[in-house]
Structures are given as C-alpha cells and as structure tokens.
Amino acid sequence: MSTGVQTKAAPGAGQHADGPRLLADIGGTNARFALETSPGEIGSVKVYPCADYPGVAEVIKRYLKDTKIGRVNHAAIAIANPVDGDQVSMTNHDWSFSIEATRRALGFDTLLVVNDFTALAMALPGLTDAQRVQVGGGTRRPNSVIGLLGPGTGMGVSGLIPADDRWIALGSEGGHATFAPADEREDIVLQYARKKWSHVSFERVAAGPGIEVIYRALAGRDKKRVAANVDTIEIVKRAMEGEPLAAESVDVFCGILGTFAGNIAVTLGALGGIYIGGGVVPRLGELFARSSFRKRFEAKGRFEAYLQNVPTYVITAEYPAFLGVSAILAEQLSNRAGGSSSAVFERIRQMRDALTPAERRVADLALNHPRSIINDPIVDIARKADVSQPTVIRFCRSLGCQGLSDFKLKLATGLTGTIPVSHSQVHLGDTATDFGAKVLDNTVSAILQLREHLNFEHVERAIDLLNGARRIEFYGLGNSNIVAQDAHYKFFRFGIPTIAYGDLYMQAASAALLGKGDVIVAVSKSGRAPELLRVLDVAMQAGAKVIAITSSNTPLAKRATVALETDHIEIRESQLSMISRILHLVMIDILAVGVAIRRAVPSADVAETVAKARQGADDDATAVLDWLSHGAASSARD
C-alpha cells in the first residue's frame, strides 16, 4: 500500500537490481516494516506489537510471510536503542539479539542496525514541505548543518553535517546536558526536580514525561493537590480543554524546549534549521504553535539576530525513520567496494547486459548471493549458476580480475560492511551457534582491520632486514612464545641460522652474543614487559636490529628498528591472547612469504625450481614459498 513516506524517485531510477529492500523502525511498543522496491518508492507498511513476538527475527519472518515476498537480500533496522557492536539489548523492551546471527537466520546478505534517531536525522534532507511544518521565521541555508531534537519518552539529539555529496549524522547524548532555568517558573521546576534526581538534565523536563514534572512543580507552587494517576497524556488533554494550570505547564515545557533547541542551534551552527521529531510535539498542535517556544529559541542575547535567521520545523511525516534508514542502507551498499564506479558490485551491474547468457547467470549469483561465491568452490558455483567451470573463470576475467581467487577477494572486500567492526561479547547462555559465530566474526573483523591499517612500508623494511640477516632470533614470553616457535619452524627452511626463545634468561644470554647483521623478532601483546625491553636494549646497543610485532604506541614499538603494529580489542593484560595471537601468526606468515619471494630464483628458472622442489630441495626458496601454501609451485604441478 502507499504510505506517507513515499517520495518521488529520481528520474530514470528503476527497481533495485538486487530486489526489494526491507526497512524497519522498531520501538519499545511497535515494530514497523516497509519494502523499498526502488529509490524513494516505499510501501507495504505494516505495524506489529512487539509484545506479540519473542524476538526480532520472529517478527521479521511474520512480516515477510504476510507480504508474500520471495527473497530479501538487504535489510536495515532503525531501533530505539544505542547500537554498539553486534549485540543489541533493548532498554525499553525485552528483546536481545545478535545482528550477525539474525542476518544468518533470515538469509540476508546485509542486515544493518542503527539507532532510530540517527535514521531520523538522515531523513531530514529528503523531507518535503508536506512532511514538515515551520514554526516562526528564519530561512534555511542550503548545504548547512542541520540540528535535530526528539522529545519522546527520552530526548534524542543529533545533527547532520554536509560532506561533499552526502551527509554525516552525529551520534549524541545531548539530552543529558544539564538543565538551566531561564525564569522564575523554571526555577520552581528545577527545585522540584532536584528532590527527585541528583542531576537534572534537559531530558528530565523537556521530554514527554517532563510535562508531568512541570505540572506537579507548578501545582506545588499553587498549593494544589494532584492525583497520582495524572500523567502527560491527561495534562495535554486538560490543556487543550483550557485548564489554566495544564496550559501553563505545556507552555513552560515548550519554553524549555525552545531554550534547548537554541542551545543546539548555536552549538552546531545549524543554519540549515532545527527539526523537532519524536512523539510529543506533533500532538500538541496549536498549543505548540502559540507557545513561547520560538521566542525562547531566539532569546540568546547577543546571538538573537543569529537565531532569528535559523528556521525551526516540526516533522509531520508519518514514518520518517524509513526515509533515513533507507538512505543509510543505500550509502552502505554503495560504499561496500569504495563507492566508485569501478567497485565490483557496480561493475557487475554495469557489465551485466554485455555478458553472455551463461556469464549473466554467474553475475546474478554474485549480486544476489555474494557469500555463496566467496565461500563455495568453483564446482559448486558453476552448479548453482547452471554453467560450466570455464564460464565462471571467463566471467571473473571479464570484470578485470585475474581469476576466481582475485574475484573472491574483491567481492569479500565489498562485503566487509556486514562484518561487525566492534568486538562482540560472548554471554552466558549463548548457544554454540551464537558464541561460535562471535568468535569467528571477531577474528575475521580483526584481520580485516589489520589489512586496512597495516603499514606495508614497515612490512617491506622488516622483510629486507630478515632477508639480509646473518642470524634471526624470535623472542616471545608466555602465549607469545607459541608465535615465536611457529616463526622458527617457518624461517629455518630459508637456510638462515634461526632459533626461538621463550625463556627470559635464555633470551638475555643469547642477546648478549648478537651484533651487527643479526635480527631479533620480538612478539608481545602488551609491548611493555620491562625485562624483555632491557634484553632488546642490550642487543641493539651491540648493533642488532629489532622487529617488533606488538600494539601501537607501546614502549616496544617505540624502541624497535621496525614496528609492525597489530592493534586489537584485547586491551587488558589480564585477558588471554586470542585475537592478538591470530594477528601475530598472520604477521609471521606475511614476513615468511615476503622473505620467500625475495629469495626465490628468477621466474625463467621456474621449471627447474619445480623439479628441485619435487626432489625435496627444501633449501630452494620457491619450494619454501610453495610449502608455506601461498606460492605458485603447487599450481604449476597441477
């Protein structure tokens, strides 16, 4: 069905090539859903009571069943809750869920979950005049910062900053800023509120429940008794009926909100306007229009003229969060592979019509089921696309990729947005599916972040030092000794004198014998062990070089000749190294492959190299590269 959020699609915009997108706005009471079939075309809106369903996945399944939609590849949820990492536990309802586990359970390629106020903020640039009402004067300045307030059960605060051709939404807890009264009536309100709370924030008096606080404070001033069952809804009803105390309370509420909105405007420089959402103000109607809101908004002394030019709007769109979450999802999908026209998803769409019918089936599989392409062997990919294996390879090369492996890497890069970038905590009661997925996702996320932030110039320097070393010693204490032993096992195949020490006394004794041309690779999660640092100082003073595999800005990283920084979430020394150990092992693999490439014979002698490798010539670096599982010798045999 058509809804109030439906907007005119861009000229020439067709349906989403990857199918309809599921949009959701989930609050503490209701879960609202819609389908976006093409940019700006949002329909099939349905509302479900949260209390009727045990969790998010169940209510989404019900919506998909009710709308009789075949498959959804991409979905986005705006939720009335902070979103930090993979695990979401609603504060105003008893739902708790893992984003990634829910995505897998529903079979989505993408499931994006954002704070509902962030989604509302992203909707603002697309609102039409029919979806907002201006209160007071002022003229909106294009391409300027926009502010947003949302008095509801709490007080949401956000802002939008223009950045080239897009907007950046600010996360904020501005509603918890300290309330400061501006007149005698507000002094009375503050005195009353202080008896209830040690810290009185604007949220206490300018959100929905604040109307009741104000009403009871002013009733105390007038020595009037207020029944216990009088709440905000009843007070607003009385104000509309003309009861003096209720009308005064609503006006004080609007004045406080005006002060707060003015604070946000001058703080953000919101020349693009201040928007008011939430469930309270739109229901006040003429009470708000006639209130002291705008007068108090402008009452900033020397900045009164500044604020007179800033417009204020009340959002009247029925489902504005759908517009915002749609914009966030669209940007997320666009940014999967850099957002440029050469991005792998966009390139597939652009080239699809020029492909052969068989290659087109592979393209459709990649667009609709990208994880299947990434995870499956070529025989399964060919079977699912109903093509031959050579057709899969031809498709990859038609996109400019060297082969299937190269295409999988580029496709995986485009999908990293669905992998949590924050550490997901394992909780008591998690099923094996949940905690297993969290451990794997945390590890994958850490490796992807390492790939993005690793200084490859430092990697090159470290490889050069190792390749030219007279002797290499690997030092690691405790859990890091596992990494040192693994490195020793790999590097001794290069014919360089190599050893690993996990005992501090052996490290000290050996380091005293090192000198120019020798290299120590020190592996440490904390990078702060004073005994290890003293040992390395002795070796470096004698001319040895030190490669550190550790966290950034640690004493070890600062001392080392070359630091390979592997930052991770395990920041407390009391935590067992799990993710950090994996990252350290990955760094050793990178260094070993790099040295193998440096020491490999010229490509013209590959045939001879393969022959030597078959004869067990382990000292040949090309054979070692193959032994490390990253080389080409094995493929040359096949």
Swiss-Prot record:
It catalyses: D-glucose + ATP = D-glucose 6-phosphate + ADP + H(+). The keyword Kinase applies. It comes from the Bacteria. Residues 342-638 are annotated as: Putative HTH-type transcriptional regulator. PROSITE patterns: HTH_LACI_1, HTH_RPIR, SIS. Residues 1-341 are annotated as: Glucokinase. One of its GO terms (cellular component) is cytosol. Pfam families: Glucokinase, HTH_6, SIS. GO terms for biological process: glycolytic process. Residues 1-20 are annotated as: Disordered. The keyword Kinase applies. Coiled coil: none annotated. Its EC number is 2.7.1.2. InterPro entries: ATPase_NBD, Bacterial_glucokinase, Glucokinase, Homeodomain-like_sf, HTH_RpiR, RpiR-like_SIS, SIS_dom, SIS_dom_sf. It is found in: Cytoplasm. Keywords: ATP-binding, Cytoplasm, DNA-binding, Glycolysis, Kinase, Multifunctional enzyme, Nucleotide-binding, Transcription, Transcription regulation, Transferase. Gene3D superfamilies: 3.30.420.40, 3.40.367.20, Glucose-6-phosphate isomerase like protein, domain 1, Winged helix-like DNA-binding domain superfamily/Winged helix DNA-binding domain. ATP binds at A24, D25, I26, G27, G28, T29. One of its GO terms (molecular function) is DNA-binding transcription factor activity. Residues 378-397 bind DNA. Residues 462-601 form the SIS domain. Residues 342-418 form the HTH rpiR-type domain. HAMAP family: Glucokinase. In the N-terminal section; belongs to the bacterial glucokinase family. NCBIfam families: glk, PRK00292.1-3, PRK14101.1. This is Bifunctional protein glk. It comes from Paraburkholderia xenovorans (strain LB400).
